[in-house]
Design a protein with these regions (language model features):
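Composition- and surface-driven signal marking solvent-exposed, interaction-prone regions
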Residues: 103-106, 288, 318-321
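A glycine- and small-residue-enriched flexible loop/hinge signal that marks low-structured segments
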Residues: 1-256, 260, 265, 275-277
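C-terminal edge-of-domain segments
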Residues: 291-323
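C-terminal structured domain segments
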Residues: 257-298
Length: 323
């Protein structure tokens, strides 16, 4: 409540009425008209009560408020609210294992529905999914502020959501940070990475993300260790989401499910993949790697797409010869 300000000003269109504006951290979140306090309706930030006429004020800063207790149901409601919207990354800054489990189940269900998004949590490597990122430690800012692992989720979420499809966040610097809150030895760092844990380390006096990875670690012959790298995953997500958008925008309900119609869709898919190759997200794109055939139903189409993602250079093996 301490970040809420209420501004009351005269309404120029309706004489005698006032505009009551609720501001949160400097942003307008609610606006309504009224003559008296009784005319006002409560909103998500302020519960208006009382009687009497309204009076102008440049800004009444509310005091004594608190955030209240966040319940598991609040997180469940949040996930239900955002599900209908398109998004690429969400972060849940909590240490509660039960909430992490609920969020992970939610993200995995979206994956089963064909939506490829990523979730950022702290210390939850057991998710074992390319759709879930787990952050192990936090950072210390130059003014001494401690950003713990649950709070640093916000930075990782922003960095992940803002990364280009052909960009890795490995060694991405945390602006303003001078140290990490928990230091690890090289062996401990290696073990954490193998366990699917993203962490911060200090390199050349910079606090950086040691490696841009997710929690996937149950490798198989069909799904290898490349899936643990977030740049590779972003590329695969872009292929999935981009082709889906292409289909929904230009073909579903519009194109004929004939040889010519499917070939037209195939050509557009190839063009899309070639664009990704042009920005060095993919390599070796050839038409033979894209197959579009008629499905079992008369209105269904089956697409098979083979791609080769390009990862960033992260490992250097060097031999120095002395002569």
């Amino acid at each position: 409540g301490n970040n809420i300000t209420v501004v009351i000003q005269n309404n120029i269109d309706v004489p005698g009425n006032f505009e009551v504006i609720t501001m949160f951290e400097g942003n307008k979140v609610d606006k309504q008209l009224g003559k008296t306090i009784a005319d006002l309706k409560s909103n998500s930030y302020v519960d208006f009560k009382g009687t009497g006429d309204l009076k102008t004020t440049a800004g009444l800063v509310l005091k004594g408020g608190d955030d209240g207790a966040v319940t598991n149901q609040a997180y469940t409601d949040y996930l239900g609210t955002i599900e209908p919207y398109e998004f690429h990354t969400i972060g849940i800054p909590t240490k509660d294992a039960s909430i992490k489990a609920v969020a992970t189940t939610f993200i995995k269900r979206l994956k089963e529905d064909g939506r490829q998004v990523q979730l950022v949590l702290e210390n939850y490597p057991e998710a074992d999914s390319e759709n879930v990122i787990s952050v192990k430690n936090g950072v210390v800012l130059s003014d001494g502020t401690l950003i713990t692992s649950d709070k640093v989720v916000a930075f990782i979420t922003g960095a992940t959501a803002g990364a280009n499809v052909n960009q890795s966040n490995t060694y991405l610097e945390y602006p303003g940070a001078i140290d990490v809150d928990k230091k690890y030895t090289n062996r401990e760092i290696e073990e954490a990475l193998l366990n699917g844990e993203m962490l911060f380390s200090v390199s050349n006096n910079r606090v950086v993300i040691e490696q841009d990875i997710n929690t996937f670690k149950s490798f198989t012959s069909d799904k290898g260790k490349d899936y643990r790298k977030n740049r590779v995953v972003r590329i695969l997500f872009e292929v999935n989401n981009g082709i889906r958008l292409l289909w929904e925008t230009n073909y579903i309900g519009k194109g004929d499910n004939s040889v010519d119609g499917r070939n037209l869709f195939k050509k557009d898919v190839i063009k899309f993949l070639e664009k990704l190759q042009g920005i060095e997200a993919l390599e070796n794109v050839i038409p033979e790697d894209v197959e579009v055939i008629k499905g079992t139903d008369k209105d269904s189409v089956v697409a098979r797409v083979e791609v080769q993602p390009i990862d960033a250079m992260e490992k250097l093996y060097m031999t120095v010869e002395v002569r």
